[in-house]
Swiss-Prot record:
It holds the Pfam family HsdM_N. Belongs to the N(4)/N(6)-methyltransferase family. Disulfide bonds: none annotated. The methyltransferase is composed of M and S polypeptides. NCBIfam families: hsdM. This is Type I restriction enzyme MpnII methylase subunit. S-adenosyl-L-methionine binds at residues 208-213, 240-242, 265. The lineage of its organism: Bacteria, Bacillati, Mycoplasmatota, Mycoplasmoidales, Mycoplasmoidaceae. The subtype gamma methyltransferase (M) subunit of a type I restriction enzyme. As the bacterial DNA is methylated on this sequence and this is the only type I methylase in the genome, it is probably responsible for all of the methylation on this site in the genome. The R subunit has multiple frameshifts and is probably not expressed in this bacteria. PANTHER family: SITE-SPECIFIC DNA-METHYLTRANSFERASE (ADENINE-SPECIFIC), SLR6095 PROTEIN.
């Protein structure tokens, strides 16, 4: 299974590279991602709609094929109404991805392909306003970044048209099976690869947009725990939605058909990627709500909190928020009294918003819920305001566990992060559980990743809360207080590498030898400089 997964992922990546090569030199890689991702989305919508119509109509007419119909088909209005009610959108037969590509391959008149695509995307979005219009917000602006008139695609209309043809025909050749039938999330892997590839070129953090699937799976399994079903899942910095979608893979599609997905994302392009990802995974438009706004400084999050399935908060909170970014903090007076932050005794430092995200997650967490948050290591031990917030979290018994992750898990950073696990329903006597997963990885290309075996070991240990030498330990809160509220895993769990005690005498002797050698080298350097000076003084510049 693991070999098949790798082969499929490599196949998707190879095809994406081929597309990138075809457009290389004409458009910036970071901008190009929108063309491929929206092209994939367009293909998915078309195939998804055809499957919906064909499955329904072939019960009475085995030869029915929606893609072979004409736009003036006698029952087209009835089909349109059915699609709007069930899918939230509609595409005319002539506007289907496969029919547009067919026209390109048959070398029909495609000089106006740019306007054709623009009209198609406009019509799809307008169709979401029909019926009760509930799907409008889920589709609004999704095609905005597919600019068919972008001069970077080519200096003339003819060149741009050829590039668009190449793009669509290449996307058509991608072997992307349905999500539930594939041993990998093919569309998700395409997203992950594209975003990380272009993020590196643009100097952006891949973690800003897509959390790798192995880390996403670990976070989701930690937050879900031993539950068979959940009502809702929330990600306060959802990026392209990879973490939210892991709930489906962990629990299975049968048990997640009624799950509500909530997310918030500050970057508009990434916000669009997330909504597309929800739709690509057959999440009903009524079951996801993604907001484009600043999580920390606006009140938009309240819309989620009010509408979540549980009156007292979300059942599952998973997130990989940006590390140590600056935020308004105490420069914005209303944040001091904000219900999410006021009980902690201080706001997170203006230059490091990490714990502001943690406090936000805690506030929206339900009484029976679990939050699993990827954190920058510094927030676990730094003094000042961050220590004050850790004190609040520990004293109020909200910290359930801290899990150290291996370094180099993300494609654009080698930082060794940790997972902070929060709960509100802990017993007063419950200790905090620490797991050192720093050695739980396999090497793949230039990065580390968590194998299924690595994930299983960490999850099993977390669920059982069973101590294991050099791997996991339960620590009483009093001991953490004595350690100045330091939550670093290495403070309480000793790895194999740290077991060997240092011989102080040998260490001091080595230091003395280094110091003596340093003195000797300095003396030799001084002698060399002096010799050079003497030689220079003896030079007769008049000869």
């Amino acid at each position: 299974m693991e070999k098949k997964r790798t082969e499929q992922r490599n196949g998707v990546e190879k095809k994406i590279w081929e597309i990138a090569d075809k457009l290389r030199g004409t458009i910036d890689g970071w901008d190009f991602k929108s063309y491929v991702l929206i092209g994939l989305f367009y293909r998915f919508l078309s195939e998804n709609l055809c499957k919906y119509f064909n499955d329904s109509e072939r019960r009475n007419n085995p030869d029915f094929s929606y893609e072979n119909l004409t736009d003036d088909y006698e029952a087209i209005d009835a089909l349109k109404d059915a699609a709007i009610a069930s899918k939230g959108f509609f595409i005319k037969p002539s506007q289907l991805f496969q029919n547009v590509v067919k026209s390109i391959r048959e070398n029909k008149n495609n000089e106006d392909l740019n306007t054709t695509l623009r009209d198609i995307f406009d019509d799809i979005e307008k169709s979401t306003e029909l019926g009760d219009g509930r799907s409008k917000e889920s589709f609004k602006g999704l095609f905005k970044d597919f600019n068919v008139s972008e001069v970077k695609l080519g200096s003339t209309l003819t060149i741009r048209t050829e590039k668009l043809k190449e793009l669509l025909t290449s996307i058509d050749t991608m072997e992307l099976d349905e999500f539930e039938k594939n041993s990998i999330d093919a569309f998700g892997d395409a997203y992950e690869f594209l975003i990380s590839m272009y993020a590196q070129n643009a100097g952006k953090s891949g973690g800003e947009f897509f959390t790798p699937q192995d880390i996403s799976e670990l976070l989701a399994r930690i937050a879900i725990g031993k539950k068979d079903t959940v009502d809702d899942v929330y990600d306060m910095a959802c990026g392209s939605g990879s973490l939210l979608l892991q709930v489906i893979k962990v629990l299975g599609k049968e048990k997640t058909s009624l799950v509500s997905y909530y997310g918030q994302e500050i970057n508009h392009t990434t916000y669009n990627l997330c909504r597309m990802n929800m739709i690509l995974h057959n999440i009903d438009y009524a079951n996801f709500n993604i907001i484009n706004a600043d999580t920390l400084t606006t009140k938009e999050w309240e819309k989620h909190y009010v509408n979540c399935s549980n009156e007292n908060g979300f059942e599952v909170v998973v997130s990989n928020p940006p590390y140590s970014i600056s935020w308004a903090g105490d420069k914005k007076s209303n944040l001091v009294s904000d219900v999410r932050f006021k009980d902690a005794g201080t706001l997170a430092p203006n230059s490091k918003a990490d714990l502001a995200f943690v406090l936000h997650a805690l506030y929206v967490l339900g009484q029976e819920g679990t939050a699993a948050i990827v954190c920058f290591p510094g927030i676990l031990y730094r003094e000042g305001k961050e220590q004050t917030i850790r004190k609040y979290l520990v004293d109020q018994n909200f910290v359930d566990a801290v899990i150290q992750l291996p370094s180099n898990l993300f494609s654009t950073t080698s930082i060794a992060t940790s997972i902070l696990v929060l709960k509100k329903n802990r017993d007063k006597k419950d200790p905090i559980f620490f797991i050192d997963g720093s050695n739980e990885f396999v090497r793949e290309k230039k990065n580390n990743r968590l194998s299924p075996k690595n994930i299983e070991k960490i999850v099993d240990c977390f669920n059982s809360k069973k101590e294991e030498a050099n791997f996991a330990k339960s620590v009483e809160r009093d001991k953490i207080r004595e350690s100045n509220y330091d939550l670093t895993v290495g403070k309480y769990v000793n790895s194999e590498a740290e077991k060997e005690e240092l011989d102080i005498k040998v260490l001091n002797h080595s230091i003395d030898e280094i110091v003596d050698k340093q003195k000797d080298l300095r003396t030799k350097i001084k002698d060399i400089i002096q010799d050079i000076k003497v030689d220079f003084d003896n030079i007769d510049i008049n000869n």
